[in-house]
Amino acid sequence: MKSKRLMRPDSLRGMAGSTYDGIKKISRSRTKKVEQYTKEECARLRKAFGYSYEEYHDSIRTMALNGTEGITSMGVDTPLAALSNKQPLLFSYFKQRFAQVTNPPIDAVREKIVTNTSVYIGKEGNILKEQPENCQVLKVNNPILSDTDLLKIKGVRQPGLYPAEVMITCMKHMSLKIALERLFIEVDRVYKDGASILILTDRGVDETHVAIPSLLAVSAVHHYLVRTKKSTVMPIILESAEPREVHHFATLLGYGASAVNPYLAHETIREMVEDGLLEKDYYAAVHDYDEAILGGIVKIASKMGISTIQSYQGSQIFEAVGISKEVIDPYFTHTLSRVGGITMKEIEEDVELRHSQAFDPLGRKTDLTLESVGRHSFRSQGEHHRYNPATIHLLQQSVWQDDYTMFQEYTGQIDKEETGYLRSLMDFRYPKEGVPIEEVESVDSIVRRFKTGAMSYGSISQEAHEALAVAMNKIHGKSNSGEGGESPERLLTKGTKDDRCSAIKQVASDVWCHQPLSGKRRRDSNQDGSGGKAGRRRPPAGKESVSVDCKNSVFYSRRESDFPAAAP
């Protein structure tokens, strides 16, 4: 090759001629050679991997049926994973991060033309040297692999493409640290044997073998390959029964996996089709489920301004909440973790507990019924909810009856909450000698710094939205209009007894129009990265009303000169 410029893989493919097949595109096809499980085996595996009834019915079934994620209410009032007594999966300890101000997010729906979900599996090659060997990779349009896709990859026999399987299971009661060290030794072995595609699989869980948490295994192997300078020559494919929700797949890709095959989720869909819970073709249902997962990952990546799955892989755009440095430093290196938390011992205990619920240590018959954990909706024996029927009843009755004593009882119950939030674990330190009263700031001075959160008119109701503005204006605080703006009529109430004009006017990122400000605000708030996006089709039909007014709307500009000057 005479040219010294860097070239695209498809250009190199043409130059390679008949010597190399170039990029191998994996298309979906149907085969009967995929390993299948009986209903009892599926039920036992679901129990061993901690599936819940909500995940079975509301998550997997919904995505397989509709091809999109299920719609749930905003807000989380359940405990953090580290404070929960329901043994949450390791995925739950990682929180997604999103762009704020410095790196504006993108709208993956309206800007679909710039998104790319394809991934290339194989040796990356030398980007500084043009050679046909750089094209010895597999092109996969969706990193969520069907069982048949993975079967094809396992059977690939092409120059430079040598897949090798490594088990991520270990003997029951074995230390996870020892299991991971053995895993590293096995990875080195297949590397020396010439493997260029590493397939981590947890098929083989039984009475005596437990699965290493898939996220721990993937991240540990990824960082081991990085430390030993092998990450560019041996990408990771995960074959696991554990992932089933969008967040699970996002963390796996973010911590180094190139593709994931959720075989138990697919087997669960097969079972639903056979039992009549899904009235559609099995292959269509699996395809829709995989597409729903992919769409969710694209949405998550877009919050960071990332438009391609390849850029998202290995990016580690997560913050760990409730994991100790003993786990973070060696296995999730460079992950942000501001507080300590669980160690390898607690992770082992959770794995052992879930396994014992599926395979009784004494050989007795086990109850394989999925537990209704109640993470999305309250259950009497389920996950703790800060706002439960008891507290909501007190709040409603205190307001309806105008009973301040009952309201104090409500706030007392909220203050007594001992689980769920980090702040509930902290208390004030009071000096023994007290504080001179002249050094104490007055209540009137303190409340002037109070601000409400940015809650748009469409997210709550007219009464609640206006009540917040009136209340904050009376105590000289500041309410935030939210990205939906507010009616121009409310601007006319400024200075009156019931001033309904929000002190802070929020301007969203080119999503919603807003009324001219006309100096009627004390502060501006710019929002990026969250809120309802116009192309996502998420607003419930019942929230559409005649109050939506597009008249007198103006375009949003980032230039200061386009806005009227604020009142002095």
Protein language model regions, located:
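Short hydrophobic alpha-helical runs that function as membrane-insertion/retention elements
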Residues: 198-200, 259-264, 479-482
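Catalytic cores of alpha/beta
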Residues: 242-256
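Glycine-rich beta-to-alpha transition loops that act as phosphate-gripper elements at the mouths
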Residues: 234-246, 483
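Flexible, glycine-rich loop/tail regions that form catalytic "lids" or insertion modules at the edges
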Residues: 1-177, 186-190, 194-197, 248-249, ...
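Active-site-adjacent beta->alpha loops and helix N-cap segments on the catalytic face
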Residues: 207-220, 268-278
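Glycine-rich, proline-tolerant flexible connector loops at the mouths of alpha/beta enzymes
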Residues: 200-216, 488-490, 558-568
